[in-house]
């Protein structure tokens, strides 16, 4: 029997049956991506992006390789028009598009923004025509033709959408599509506006339209039934050559098709190329999350925190042997890193690997004791982070590195219209070192001063702050993860609890530095030890 899975060298590990099923299907070699994070994505409830935010996201999308960026809806407001104009004037390689209703006034607003193209929409389903627009099908057709012709007469690339297209009769869709094609429409989009298609139906629906039009087709799918990505891919099988999507699946109601899932689905399942640099996906996802204030769910496909995280002992053992055992792709392909989480389901391999990451090696019996403590801790409902695991490890072996670095003095100054400045004196193996640095805030200044006193080779890889109690005098917990520029394998953790965020951060840094210092000395030769830092 032919195996269902072969280990490829592409870094993507999917079933061979996909290729067998779709080998006879005619599909495009490449698909364009229209990203509408700045328009449909911004319509996510409680999201409002400034012009500066839109430019930042547009630049990131451009660098990632997005073909078309739908920058906004200029007629909506002066601020929106300003944002679209600023994106259009940013010198990006991507085609910059503006959304317009089938109205000359909307198109004029887009023209004032100097965009490359417009995406014109007009609802065509019976419910929209009768209940919302209160116009006939003939009037809708004529409005569509007039809008497309107006855009073309003004030198714009025009993409047209029959809003609520998947609930519009195919006969009427064909009438509208034929009419706008005759006046020069460049692309036709098929929107599943309220996410009501199944993938099989979407493929056939797009294929029917494909038979009646000559211009390129796009699809635009919403996630009301959780089918947006599947329907987007299904539309490509039916003949679409462009997909509308948003970063992290942002959008109205349940959201839109997620760009990262669409792109990886096209590549992994159908070997269809896009211009997207997939290694930038995780960065762009984080940027969009930060600027919109919408957190990415931990179990989100491709870019979620847990997408390449493993806790189960069986899974960890498998992944340590070969990543393809429990991962469908290499994490670095999408800009992620594999992580092992220690918890209730962990086995020796996971705990051993995590402790080894921070330079702590234990005997088999000691490791079993650590695992037993970890499981007991987890079963009581507590989450064990890396710093706490490290503390358990040191407790089991009965040693903790003697601190070579001691904080002797620390001062920080900050205030309104005053550049935050920090000064530290660190005693390192009996020698006092003083350093002063500025920063964007008191914590940044303090971290910079500590690094200057010890070594510029220190890298603050992670900083995590959590409030333990409530109120203005709440206790806080700071955890830092430090690395070394000269040796990527050297990592350490520091953790501290206190009522002052700045001093607690400094204490965590000093603890982390002591552990990093000890690890550095362990791998240095005798000659190098005195100049380790």
Set out the residue ranges of the language-model regions.
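Catalytic alpha/beta core domains of metabolic enzymes, predominantly
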Residues: 197, 201-321
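Non-catalytic terminal/interface segments that mediate subunit docking, oligomerization
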Residues: 20-24, 30, 43-44, 48, ...
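Alpha/beta enzyme core
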Residues: 2-7, 43-68, 82-90, 104-217, ...
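Short beta-alpha connecting loops at secondary-structure transitions
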Residues: 93, 129, 192, 244-252, ...
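A mid-to-C-terminal "edge-of-domain" accessory segment
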Residues: 2-37, 266, 270-436, 472-475
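Short, ordered loop/turn segments at secondary-structure junctions
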Residues: 73-74, 101-102, 122-125, 163-165, ...
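N-terminal capping/small domains of soluble enzymes
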Residues: 1-104, 339-342, 346-348, 352
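Mixed-charge, glycine-accented linear interaction segment located at domain edges/termini
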Residues: 488-493, 497-526, 530
